[in-house]
Design a protein with these regions (language model features):
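Small-residue-rich transmembrane alpha-helical segments that form helix-helix packing/gating elements
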Residues: 1-34, 39-171
């Protein structure tokens, strides 16, 4: 092993360690706020990476259809909650269900950025709203459940997201 290979391995180790540290930090933050051990956290990273690859290949990331479907479902659930007389925070609901999906659609369909920073922004805007949307759709109705039950639901969500990833991105 020469110095160049050692430096490349060291750089790879630092980058991999940073990714693991960020994932661990995200897991702790999500658990401390929501009591959910979010097993499906890795799927968000995978969705972002595969969306970035699709954008760089000049294709429309198929994950935009999942984002639109989630946004529509959450909007319908919030309308149903309001019809039942439950309070609804329309500012955050419209942000996550209308504004950010519309921005993602504009970036993916209309702008199609050519530089890597714009492509990264597009991938992030495509994937980021899915976290709060899935929380509102899956975990908020179970807010008073035990941590064990939330873990079981999180594992189920993980498998659903793996299946959706295979459907939208292919094997």
């Amino acid at each position: 092993m020469n110095t160049q290979i050692a430096l490349m391995l060291a750089q790879d180790g630092v980058v991999t360690g940073a990714v693991y540290a960020l994932m661990a930090l995200a897991l702790v933050l999500v658990f401390s706020v929501t009591r959910v051990i979010l097993i499906a956290q890795g799927e968000f990273v995978t969705y972002a990476a595969l969306s970035m690859a699709a954008i760089q290949a000049g294709a429309l990331p198929a994950i935009i259809w999942l984002l639109m479907a989630l946004a529509l479902l959450v909007l319908l659930v919030e309308l149903w909650r309001q019809a039942r007389g439950l309070p609804v925070d329309w500012r955050s609901t419209l942000l996550w269900t209308v504004l950010l999906p519309a921005l993602a659609a504009l970036l993916a369909w209309g702008v199609k950025p050519q530089n890597v920073w714009g492509q990264m922004l597009t991938a992030i805007v495509l994937v980021t709203p899915m976290g709060p949307l899935l929380y509102r759709l899956v975990f908020r109705p179970l807010a008073h459940a035990s941590v064990l039950f939330l873990l079981i639901v999180s594992v189920a969500l993980h498998w659903v997201m793996v299946g959706l990833g295979l459907y939208f991105f292919g094997a």
